[in-house]
């Protein structure tokens, strides 16, 4: 069984495309909480309200980091998606963390981001532009079969 952590942007259905495409493979997927409000507010919901947004955000970030660290540590493969909009600092951090742990890293982004992400891409074992390519990488890793 291959354990795959899906990190990165939360505004498109790329995760669902990969999970659906890999449903016939022996893969278990995990990832961050993708409900933006729940992710932002988990700290204060669990540990209590804060009057200052800095501490509100810090509590959430730290609890989310526990989940992220465990997910990446447990994974055999980490896929990090950089989407078309927003500054995706969390995705970049997750990619660096996974690389530092020696995880097999697949980066997913459009050609428009190739220059900006060249160092991140250089740390990856594969750089894909479509979720279907990630599925085919997983299929090849598990079965040795080409598309």
Identify the residue ranges that each predicted region occupies.
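Conserved catalytic or regulatory cores that recognize and/or transform ribose-phosphate-containing ligands
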Residues: 1-147
